Amino acid sequence: SSLSVSGIQRAQKAIMTTDTFSKGATAFFSVSGRKASVCGVAKGAGMIAPDMATMLCFIFTDAALGPGPLQAALKKAVAPTFNCITVDGCMSTNDNVILLANGACGAGKISGGKDYSSFCSALEAVCRELALMMVRDGEGASKFISISVEGALNDRQARTGALAVANSNLFKTAVYGENRNFGRIIAALGASGIKFDPGKIRLKAGSLKRRDVDVYVHLGAGRGKAVVYTSDLTPEYIKINAEYS
């Protein structure tokens, strides 16, 4: 009886905990000439780390797909999105990303080809928008940080290195204090165990006075690359988690 067009907005708000704003995203695509959509709602601001964390995400599509194609699409979509964000490096036991399809758009069942590619692109776009909202809403965060690592031996090592920097308390507090201490980035990369020659590293960072901070590292060891998103570590984060129960 509570179903309505505005129900999705109420659902966004109902699942919030320490979030400061509700999170929703929608993307559209075409299936055999018919308009279809992917819509998602999520919550999460703290205990956010790869392999998810204390976050909930519910994604819906009115396209028709079977369990196999849905699972494959979701696995692909979360890899560069939800599994490449971290607020504090802490995970929880109650994380979830759920994808449901009802076929209500009236097009035929999608199993592959161009329509499946279009669906996968729309799904990843929704996952990315929701994931980045979580980082921007990180508990106590004053900065949104993008860490791009290129030139690694492979993509896995690039992601490992980027995550090591993103989860470094020394790096995160330096960004909060607008302190360009790049030694903390190099130290985090070295401690991550990935292979590179420190003498070949190239490092660039945007202004730390801005809300959005971009960090770029080239390791000079190969062609692997990854991007991880995080936030700074502030006194407000400590206050929130010291008082939360």
For each predicted feature, which ranges?
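A structural signal for small-residue-enriched, beta-sheet-centric alpha/beta enzyme cores
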Residues: 1-245
